[in-house]
């Protein structure tokens, strides 16, 4: 009979789907896999593996369904992992879990296990709602930041849902909560989002572990005067583990502003020009969406004349690219929305 330590080591090497099947082997295996110790250890090892790309497609003019697909590199793509109808808010994907709104309720889903849970309702009748998902890598906790208010000119209130056990809500007692106005991003336990203030648009940081706000981050002058995050001309991205602002000047020209020092609020700028020689001539660009985790590879979405979607990986140093066909997945036209999460890792979180 093998020792428990050796069994744990064997189980840690399994992908999530085979690991989930091991729950049915015997009571001992199920106890080990469901233990907080094993889940934390599995998560810490998963973070060191090569991330996947998770992308979501919404077809605006047909069923308004979000379809989620996961992919490894360089060959993609697996079949859809889950879908959600009539979602009025764009989904979020953090550390292997997806948060999406369906029928005015929040759901958290694990694509690797194909299981999900309904987040207990908080302020269900509030007219204005906004949420972000975050992950605390120190305590291995997933949290949802939920902003709500009844009237347009009213201040937002903020509640935080912690996904642990039965789940719990906590009201954040802060005056003048920064009003969310852009999509957010979670990097190393900090949720960043854009907020309108008396001094214009600023970046807000919320520390997931302590559930406290940090100081505002000023957007670089050269970016704030030209680009508008509210209308999608720029987006927050993870560039080699740092917060960055990817600002579109056109479909082929971008400015990448990288936050080098959050304390000193020092930004660096890189200008990106995508030339036609980098792509097949029969592809129509939809736009850049982010970077492959830990690299200089820019990911650009595109479609061919049959509206089949491609991901194009552009090596900015070598000035070359590789195109990946997504198995015939189609968008209806250029207005179909494609979201890409470039640092997806499988989670053993059993929902």
Curated annotation (Swiss-Prot):
Residues 1-41 form the F-box domain. InterPro entries: F-box-assoc_dom_typ3 (IPR013187), F-box-assoc_interact_dom (IPR017451), F-box-like_dom_sf (IPR036047), F-box_dom (IPR001810). This is Putative F-box protein At5g52610. It comes from Arabidopsis thaliana (Mouse-ear cress).
């Amino acid at each position: 009979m093998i020792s428990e330590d050796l069994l744990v080591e064997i189980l840690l090497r399994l992908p999530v789907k085979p690991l989930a099947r091991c729950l049915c082997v015997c009571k001992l295996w199920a106890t080990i896999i469901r233990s907080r110790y094993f889940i934390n250890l599995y998560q810490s090892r998963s973070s060191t593996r090569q991330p996947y790309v998770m992308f979501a497609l919404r077809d605006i003019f047909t069923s308004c369904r979000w379809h989620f697909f996961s992919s490894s590199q360089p060959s993609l793509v697996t079949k859809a992992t889950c879908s959600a109808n009539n979602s009025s808010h764009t989904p979020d994907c953090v550390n292997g879990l997806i948060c999406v709104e369906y029928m005015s309720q929040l759901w958290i889903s694990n694509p690797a296990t194909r299981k999900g849970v309904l987040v207990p309702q908080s302020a269900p009748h509030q007219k204005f709602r906004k949420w972000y998902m975050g992950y605390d890598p120190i305590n291995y906790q997933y949290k949802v930041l939920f902003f709500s208010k009844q009237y347009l000119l009213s201040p937002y209130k903020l509640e935080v849902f912690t996904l642990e056990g039965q789940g719990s809500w906590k009201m954040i007692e802060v005056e003048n909560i920064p009003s969310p106005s852009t999509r957010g991003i979670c990097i190393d336990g900090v949720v960043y989002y854009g907020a309108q203030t008396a001094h214009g648009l600023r970046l807000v940081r919320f520390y997931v572990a302590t559930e406290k706000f940090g100081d505002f981050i000023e957007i670089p002058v050269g970016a704030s005067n030209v680009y508008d995050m509210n209308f999608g001309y720029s987006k927050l991205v993870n560039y080699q583990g740092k917060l960055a602002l990817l600002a579109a000047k056109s479909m082929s020209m971008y400015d990448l502003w990288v936050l080098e020092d959050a304390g000193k609020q020092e930004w660096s700028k890189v200008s990106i020009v995508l030339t036609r020689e980098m792509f097949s001539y029969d592809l129509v660009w939809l736009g850049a969406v982010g970077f492959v985790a830990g690299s200089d590879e820019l990911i650009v979405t595109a479609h061919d004349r049959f509206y089949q979607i491609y991901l194009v990986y552009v090596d900015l140093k070598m000035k070359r690219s590789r195109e990946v066909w997504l198995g015939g997945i189609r968008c209806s036209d250029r207005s179909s929305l494609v979201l890409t999460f470039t640092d997806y890792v499988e989670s053993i979180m059993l929902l």
